[in-house]
Amino acid sequence: MANTLNYLDIKTVVVSCGTCYDQLQGYKFEDIFPGCRIIDIHEYLLEKNIRLENGAGYLYHDPCHTPMKLQDPMKTVKALVGDAVVKSARCCGESGTLGVTRPDISTQVRFRKEEELRKDETALRAVQAARGLAAPDADLKILTSCPSCLQGLSRYGEDLKSGLLEADYIVVEMARKILGENWMPEYVKRANAGGIERVLV
């Protein structure tokens, strides 16, 4: 990998996944990316002063392998999307391949998370009502930074007392709010026109 990338003048490696961060940092990072730093995308966005001005209020699921290393993840999330954030505790039940390899255990974990989500819904709706942010029966969003957790959280869509629970990445929610609903096709178009260098490793 180091030989493949050595022609690029890389200063910073930005990652969005906690497991990827840990693997890169723990496996000869300095040999592969000499003189580079590694940073989580959420902390990178804060560094660049990119944040939502008027977040509608969110639930936040902190993954077991959080990529946010510089400060408490909740502090980072609130700085990015606003103070109206309620942390949703407990594992989502996905845990990498746990949902596939041990559905018996995963299902029990899922039941506990479902109970937690109902409490979190009540707490977030109270925060939203106090700040006039959303209708009492509006759908809620739960944000995370982990691909496995996003998959697990997507299974809870119908489990709230009122409204639906929509799971998404923090950075995707920010892109949608800052750049508009069509941010993804526009990004792909720019990338395909030469905006991103593709390296096969």
Predicted regions and their residues:
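Iron-sulfur cluster-binding electron-transfer modules in prokaryotic oxidoreductases
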Residues: 1-201
